[in-house]
């Protein structure tokens, strides 16, 4: 499988809308409300903030499987001003889970963050989310945990 990072255009935000609205895909997000409504009128401001004016504090890309010609997920990170850390985000469309895309996406995200000068990448994952194991297999370690989340980190 050949997976490539794609910097989406504004008119391609419908894939992100589809990801966030899909119940199976967003089931991991149950602790924070599940699916996320993301109507088209919000796209431009979000796009300007994340893609155009990222100020090297935000990174966002689609994962494209070139073999099948489909987007399979998204990867991102952003600098959290409250905790003073870079937080990762990866979402794989439910029908593509269990096929290795998350491993590839996580490695591409870490490589991109490192190239952009990020030294440590974190992710706060719901305590009952099975993806914790995947992050640990990909070099993340537990930083701390609460009753709600496990904070994982990887030194890049």
Feature roles, as predicted:
Residues 16-24, 43-47:
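Hydrophobic alpha-helical core bundles mediating ligand binding, dimerization, or RNAP-core interactions
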Residues 26-37:
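A short gly/proline-enriched turn/hairpin at secondary-structure junctions
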Residues 113-126:
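Conserved GNAT acetyl-CoA-binding A-motif
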Residues 127-128, 145-156:
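C-terminal "cap" of GNAT-fold acetyltransferases
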Residues 103, 126-144:
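Conserved active-site alpha-helix within GNAT-family acetyltransferase domains
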Residues 1-14, 18, 27-29, 141, ...:
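Conserved N-terminal entry element of GNAT/NAT acetyltransferase domains
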Residues 36-87, 93-95:
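Acetyl-CoA-dependent GNAT
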Residues 96, 100-108:
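Conserved acetyl-CoA pyrophosphate-binding loop and the N-cap/start of the following alpha-helix
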